[in-house]
Curated annotation (Swiss-Prot):
Gene null: resulting phenotype: Chemical composition modifications and structural alterations of the cuticular layer of the cell wall leading to increased permeability of the cuticle, increased sensitivity to herbicide (glufosidate), increased cuticular transpiration and increased resistance to Botrytis cinerea.
Membrane-spanning ranges: 504-524, 544-564, 585-605, 623-643, 648-668, 674-694, 735-755, 1162-1182, 1202-1222, 1235-1255, 1277-1297, 1307-1327, 1334-1354, 1392-1412
Lineage of source species: Eukaryota, Viridiplantae, Streptophyta, Embryophyta, Tracheophyta
Gene assigned in the entry: ABCG32
Binding residues for ATP 2: G863, V864, S865, G866, A867, G868, K869, T870
InterPro entries in alphabetical order: AAA+_ATPase, ABC2_TM, ABC_trans_N, ABC_transporter-like_ATP-bd, ABCG_dom, ABCG_PDR_1, ABCG_PDR_2, P-loop_NTPase
GO molecular function, one term: ATP hydrolysis activity
Family stated for the protein in its record: Belongs to the ABC transporter superfamily. ABCG family. PDR (TC 3.A.1.205) subfamily.
Gene3D superfamilies, per the entry: P-loop containing nucleotide triphosphate hydrolases
Primary subcellular site in the record, as a coarse category: membrane
PROSITE patterns per the UniProt record, alphabetical: ABC_TRANSPORTER_2
Name of the protein in its database record: ABC transporter G family member 32
Length: 1420
């Protein structure tokens, strides 16, 4: 037996030796290959451990996942082991990584700003700024602006192999510093000082290729998936130095006879080779960032459902982690992420920085203590100065030396951000025998320079970096990461993929074009079309013109699609992903098939059905012409989009381009009627070439060869061309096609240049008061000043603001409690979940929730994502728009009634939605005016508003513009406080707050929570949802409602001193881990109640709570609170709203007036556009009104009216859509708060347009009427003004109406576009009413533009009895007779026309108001 066992063992050993020998032979064979081949092959083991030789580029997705699982199996816990293996491999052959040391010396960044009301974007300020900017550019004036110092001569060193944390309160200069170091500062800032990488100036290297700046803004293409986004970024950036490093590593390992780890070898080769469709590095980065679960999900936007905001933030980081940059500047990358995810990402950055000797600076808002401990160095900034730069573990010693100590239970990062703040500093003063005096940032910076760490830093900066130690691969001197031909291929594949993803848009455009073609076919039906007279020819000419306008207009969709993508393109450009032409060339080439399909469809549907010349060659020629026109159109509107760069501006530019091209195209106004000073415009109009080419192609054909008669030998076609001043040579067809193709090339070149050299429009600056600017300068310079006693009292005590304790306010309120029992909430199961096998019809989101909120008690509502925190708050506040609610809610013992509850409660939404063009004080006055009782006079309202501003610390910002979130105006933290203030001025008894500290830095969160505590101390009832709060924030609450995933309650009760009650409760449960000393109770609570812990312990925390004494006590409390006291009275109000409908309307109109006045991108651009159009059309149509000798001259006058109405109207409608969309979104919050009814808001939006449209129509009518020399009588001018006014008005109301009936302005613009085409077709200009087929005449009367043209022409010419020569050149009739016989216009119908244009205004405005009232596109 022993012998057999011995034999078995020897066989086993021999088998093992054979395997090892086989592996050695396999590696030996691999090592014998040439280096080029060797680094492209590796040994891969499958799931059972069977080795095989593979091509690195041929790894399948399943093999990649298996490899990653083996390499980084425990990435969630600690990636250190993986990086240690990487480092060990390089150390084994003594191969060093390229290191980069970044230095900045005396870095000064300054800007020039306007102060106070001069900074508000009003129309006068907008005009003055434009004029000043123009004069400044030509060095005529400097302009009166105030200097604002952003970075104040700072110096420092960022060393490789050390992870650096950048901290500082808002507006301290963190982002500016990171942008400056990355070489990405805007040209509008004045910069001085020196920045070097390894001793080399930024001008000597390509900084964006050497370093990478991760922006706060998450700009991505919505239609791409997460994986596609990362793959594209990785392929564009290339592999950098990694390929050369791999070659050297392979060479040294071969010489040393080292056999590398198989899996690591494949991974590193994949990393260095790049160019693969799905590279391992992308899979690895997705795994590290937690994006592997949504890898194939679209990024999405407001139109496309996609990944969450936190996932987008991680994707922004991942885009640059897949690249080869050795220096990373990461700006607030944790926004929207929970602390565990942030900790995981920072841990990865720490180990990669240490192992690969990278240079990394990361700016974070609220790093948890665990995350803070991962950093090696800290840079602390305040007011543009560096307060401290050095090792993390020495920073507290520095502040201790100045008399400021961090409390034991305080997060160090929070302490650092607060200790430099004037309002927070006092609480950290720790020298009892010395009175506290405020130490401004300037003094801290001065003290640091005298501190040993500061002296050491200064000494290092004195010695220049020795360039001999610069690794040859460290700094990038090439513009792009891969060859330009490869970048072109990458872009081609990317845009081809985007076209597939956007297939719906292209199909929708095609269907839209097909429908319009079918309508056109039935309007210009060959059975009603003849070839007998010049008037017949005019109808054919009109059909050709309409076809070309439709094809031209079809390219307009490029404007919104391009403008939406521009931020991403600018980001790619600035990061040197690819040259601009590598994007524009594929976009041009890929548009060719769509042009072919759409042009072919139009020609195929309309050519023979309309009755054009039957010769097939002419059919093909029309197709070629329309294809060339479509290509030119796409190029033209890409130019307009890249030049406009903002949706409203680009749309206006696009409309203007259409106007110029169409007006000077030779159809609206004939060539011989265009004044000599505008004839150059005719020759450069692309539509002119298309018009002439299409005309000769048709009218020199067989159908038009009969003699025109009237003493001429010319054919009918030739006579028509001469009559309309069109060219008559056959060669003009080829001139037209060549010109259109030439314009296509020109426009695409201009598009490329604009994309390469233009930058996004600058943001509106926040409003800075003179006092604020002066105080900022004092702090910066370190001037000493003592905090006044009142201010000290107000802000001392950090979060627990003592000043407002038991303090009364101007307006009294009634303290109320809110109790609720057995709250259940159900929603219908989505179809997607049903398809996954869920059988129930309803999904329960809240399960028997019972609790109470009391006056003077601050309650926290806490739970993991998906626990139902916001859902519970929405249910209690009555904000849910769908689902089924069960349970009882009582207000101080009385059943809750939503009509009255909205009057005594406030709801602070997480989104911070406000009207962007109001100032802070105006927003508060508006809320107070509509929500306070009607018997409170305006003086008391103002006093109360100012009291609330003081309470929430907004007094210094009272004149600041609110702006749009993430775009301009107030910072995130300031917007949070404004949201709270807007609800507080309603004098509510109960306030709900949804995530009031999300997205804020520690200091800002402390300010907000201090605000909340101040409000509670006035005796109000407040409940806040909160997500993983810091110790300070968590322990500022009095009570806690803690929910677990699934909508069940697991704790409801007091927190206690230092959370002792909470800790006592959970530690009493058997098996729950005890809290560690100094640990955050909120984080501990979430950890020990996680679903994994429930599974480990085999318990249900919800069941434990339901059986606890605490739950029983809560039920008893709710039993008491659910019954009114003897003296209590139920709250009742005589009306639903505090103000009458008229008062609501006046208040809404007041707000809209301010909003319009301060929105120059909407209002001023409209006026500017109107002035330009009136001057342009006035000079083109010079004295047209007095020329009435021929039918063509009358047609020219009609053309000028048609062009103005259509283009000013469509521009107004398009521009109004985004404005109304934003205001409607704000109104959802305001109406839910019971501020006003839908109708006063809607009619205020309607009425505010009256003066602006009146100004527009007066500007246009006065200028154009005078220049065109229409009959100068008061009656005729007033009729002209009347029709222009109401025509522009109904277009504007139509744009507003389409927005009101659709979810957003993008959908509205899609819905509106076909109607513009139909209004154009049936306006009576291209085909007179009498020539419209009988089956379509009803639509002529339903067309507002037709009534406008009717009214304008009849009011000017309907009573004119002078003779006019007809198009045959012989016969004459009176002007009014011509209008009646040819156009079908009668002077008797002038009054009807006037009534109809007014009726359309009324109709569109009423539909708008009804839609605002009836439709709610906000889903809660």
């Amino acid at each position: 037996m022993w012998n057999s066992a011995e034999n078995a063992f020897s066989r086993s050993t021999s088998f093992k030796d054979e395997i090892e020998d086989e592996e050695e032979l396999r590696w030996a064979a691999l090592q014998r290959l040439p280096t080029y081949s060797r680094i492209r092959r590796g040994i891969f083991r499958d799931m059972v451990g069977e080795p095989k030789e593979i091509q690195i580029g041929n790894l399948e997705a399943s093999e990649q996942r298996l490899l990653l699982d083996r390499l980084v199996n425990s990435v969630e816990n600690d990636p250190e082991q993986f990086f240690a293996r990487v480092r060990k491999r390089f150390d084994a052959v003594d191969l060093k990584f390229p290191k980069i040391e970044v230095r900045f010396q005396n870095l000064m960044v300054e800007s020039f700003v306007h102060v106070g009301s001069r900074a508000l974007p009003t129309i006068p300020n907008f005009i003055i700024n434009m004029a000043e900017g123009l004069l400044r550019n030509i060095h005529v004036i400097g302009g009166k602006r105030n200097k604002l110092t952003i970075l104040d001569g700072i110096s420092g060193v960022i060393r490789p192999s050390r992870l650096t944390l950048l901290l500082g309160p808002p507006s301290s200069g963190k982002t500016t510093l990171l942008l400056a170091l990355a070489g990405r500062l805007g040209t509008n800032l004045q910069t001085s000082g020196k920045i070097t990488y390894n001793g080399y100036d930024l001008k000597e290297i390509i900084a964006p290729r050497t370093s990478a700046y991760v922006s706060q803004q998450d700009w991505h293409v919505a239609e791409m998936t997460v994986r596609q986004t990362l793959e594209f970024a990785g392929r564009c950036q290339g592999v950098g130095f990694k390929y050369d490093m791999l070659l050297e590593l392979a060479r040294r390992e071969k010489l040393a006879g080292i056999v590398p780890d198989e899996d690591l070898d494949i991974f590193m080769k994949s990393l260095a080779l790049g160019g693969m469709e799905t590279s391992l590095v992308v899979e690895y980065v997705m795994k590290i960032l937690g994006l592997d679960t949504c890898a194939d999900t679209l990024v999405g936007d407001e139109m496309i459902k996609g990944i969450s905001g936190g996932q987008k933030k991680r994707l922004t980081t991942g885009e640059l982690l897949v690249g080869p940059a050795r220096v990373l500047f990461m700006d607030e990358i944790s926004n929207g992420l929970d602390s565990s995810t942030t900790h995981q990402i920072i841990m990865y950055m720490r180990h990669s920085t240490h192992a690969l000797e990278g240079t990394t600076v990361i700016s974070l808002l609220q790093p948890s203590p665990e995350t803070y401990e991962l950093f090696d160095d800290v840079i602390l900034m305040s007011e543009g100065q560096i307060i401290y730069q050095g090792p993390r573990d020495e920073v507290l010693d520095f502040f201790s030396s100045l008399g400021f100590t961090c409390p034991d239970r305080k997060n160090v990062a929070d302490f650092l951000q607060e200790v430099t703040s004037k309002k927070d500093q006092q609480q950290y003063w720790s020298v009892p025998f010395r009175p506290y005096r405020y130490v401004p940032p300037g003094k801290f910076a001065e003290a640091f320079r005298s501190y040993p760490t500061g002296k050491k830093l200064a000494k290092k900066l004195e010695v220049p970096f020795d360039k001999r130690f610069n690794h040859s691969a460290a700094l990038s001197t090439s513009q792009y990461g891969v060859k330009k031909s490869e970048l072109l291929k990458i872009n081609f594949a990317w845009q081809k993929q985007l076209m597939k993803q956007n297939a719906f848009i292209y199909v929708f455009k095609f269907v839209q074009l097909l429908l319009v073609a079918l309508i056109t076919m039935t309007v210009f039906c060959r059975t009603t079309m003849h070839h007998n007279t010049i008037d017949d020819g005019n109808i054919y000419l009109g059909s050709l013109y309409f076809s070309m306008v439709i094809i031209l207009f079809n390219g307009f969709t490029e404007v919104p699609m391009l403008v939406a993508k521009l931020p991403v393109l600018y980001k790619h450009r600035d990061l040197h992903f690819y040259p601009s032409w590598a994007y524009t060339l594929p976009s041009w080439l890929l548009s060719i098939p769509t042009s072919i399909i759409e042009s072919a469809t139009w020609v195929a549907v309309t050519y023979y059905t309309i009755g054009y010349d039957p010769l097939f060659s002419r059919f093909l020629q029309q197709f070629l012409l329309y294809f060339s026109l479509h290509q030119m159109s796409l190029g033209l509107f890409r130019v307009m989009g890249s030049l406009g760069r903002h949706m409203i501006v680009a749309n206006t530019f696009g409309s203007f381009a259409m106007l110029v091209v169409m007006t000077l195209g030779g159809f609206i106004i004939s060539r011989d009627s265009i004044p000599s000073w505008w004839i150059w415009g005719y020759w450069i109009s692309p539509l002119m070439y298309a018009q002439n080419a299409a005309s000769v192609n048709e009218f020199l054909g067989h159908n038009w060869q009969k003699t025109a008669g009237n003493h001429t030998s010319d054919s009918l076609g030739l006579a028509l061309l001469k009559e309309r001043s069109l060219f008559s040579g056959n060669y003009w067809y080829w001139i037209g096609v060549a010109a259109l193709l030439g314009y296509t090339v020109l426009f695409n070149i201009l598009f490329t240049l604009f994309l390469a050299h233009l930058n996004p429009w600058g943001k509106f600056q926040a409003v800075v008061s003179r006092e604020e600017l002066d105080e900022r300068e004092k702090k910066r310079k370190g001037d000493e000043f003592v905090v006044e006693l009142r201010e000290y009292l107000q802000h001392s005590g950090s979060i627990h603001g003592k000043y407002f304790k038991n303090r009364g306010m101007v307006l009294p309120f009634q303290p109320l409690s809110l109790s609720f029992s057995n709250i259940n909430y159900y929603v219908d199961v989505p179809l997607g979940l049903k398809e996954q096998g869920i059988l129930e019809d309803r999904l329960q989101l809240l399960v028997n929730i019972t609790g109470a909120f009391r006056p003077g008690v601050l309650t926290a509502l806490v739970g993991v994502s998906g626990a139902g925190k916001t859902t519970l708050m929405d249910v209690l506040a009555g904000r849910k728009t769908g689902g089924t609610i069960e349970g009882d809610v009582y207000i101080s013992g009385f059943p809750k009634r939503q009509e009255t509850f909205a009057r005594i409660s406030g709801y602070c939404e997480q989104n911070d939605v406000h009207s962007p063009c109001l100032t802070v004080v105006e927003s508060l006055l508006f809320s107070a005016c509509l929500r306070l009782p009607a018997d409170i006079d305006s003086e008391t309202q103002r006093a109360f508003v100012h009291e609330v501003m003081e309470l929430v610390e907004l007094t210094s910002l009272s004149g600041a513009l609110v702006g749009l979130p993430g775009v301009d105006g107030l910072s995130t933290e300031q917007r949070k406080r404004l949201t709270i203030a807007v609800e507080l001025v309603a004098n509510p008894s109960i306030v709900f707050m949804d995530e009031p500290t999300s997205g804020l830095d520690a200091r800002a969160a402390a300010i907000v929570m201090r605000t909340v505590r101040n409000i509670v101390n006035t005796g109000r009832t407040i409940v806040c949802t909160i997500h993983q709060p810091s110790i300070d924030i968590f322990e500022s609450f009095d009570e806690l409602l803690f929910m677990k995933r699934g909508g069940e309650l697991i704790y409801a009760g007091p927190l206690g001193q230092k959370s002792c009650e909470l800790i006592k409760y959970f530690e009493s449960i058997e098996g729950v881990q005890k809290i560690k000393p100094g640990h955050n109770p909120a984080a501990w609570m979430l950890d020990v109640t996680a679903s994994t812990e429930e599974h480990r312990l085999g318990v249900d925390f919800a069941e434990i709570y339901r059986n606890s004494n605490l739950c029983q006590r809560n039920k008893e409390l709710i039993e008491v609170l659910s019954k009114p006291s003897n003296i209590a009275k139920e709250i009742e109000f005589p009306t639903r709203y505090s103000q009458s409908l008229y008062s609501q309307f006046v208040a809404c109109l007041w707000k809209q007036n301010l909003s319009y006045w301060r929105n120059p991108q909407y209002t001023a651009v409209r006026f500017f556009y109107t002035v330009v159009i009136s001057l342009m059309l006035g000079t083109i149509c010079w004295k047209f009104g007095s020329k009435r000798d021929t039918q063509q001259q009358l047609f020219n006058a009609m053309g000028s009216m048609y062009a103005a109405v259509l283009f000013i109207g469509i521009t107004n409608a398009t521009a109004a859509q985004p404005v109304v969309s934003i205001e409607r979104f704000v109104s959802y919050r305001e109406r839910a708060a019971g501020m006003y009814s839908a109708l006063p808001f809607a009619f205020a939006q309607v009425f505010i347009e009256f003066p602006y449209v009146l100004a527009q129509s007066t500007i246009y009518s006065t200028i154009f009427y005078a220049m065109a020399a229409f009959e100068w009588s008061a009656v005729k001018f007033l009729w002209y003004l009347f029709f222009m006014y109401f025509s522009i008005m109904y277009f504007t109301f139509y744009g507003m109406m389409t927005t009101a009936i659709t979810p957003n302005h993008n959908v509205a613009s899609i819905i509106a576009a076909p109607f513009y085409m139909l209004w154009n077709l049936f306006s009576g200009f291209m085909i007179p009413y009498k020539r419209i087929p009988l089956w379509w005449r009803w639509y002529y009367w339903a067309n507002p533009v037709a009534w406008t043209l009717y009214g304008l022409l009849v009011s000017q010419y309907g009573d004119d009895e002078r003779s006019v020569k007809l198009s045959d050149g012989i016969h004459q009739v009176m002007v009014k007779q011509l209008l009646e016989d040819v156009m079908g216009y009668k002077h008797d119908f002038l009054g009807v026309s006037a009534i109809m244009v007014v009726a359309f205004c009324v109709f569109f405005s009423l539909v708008f108001a009804f839609a605002i009232k009836a439709f709610n596109f906000q889903r809660r």
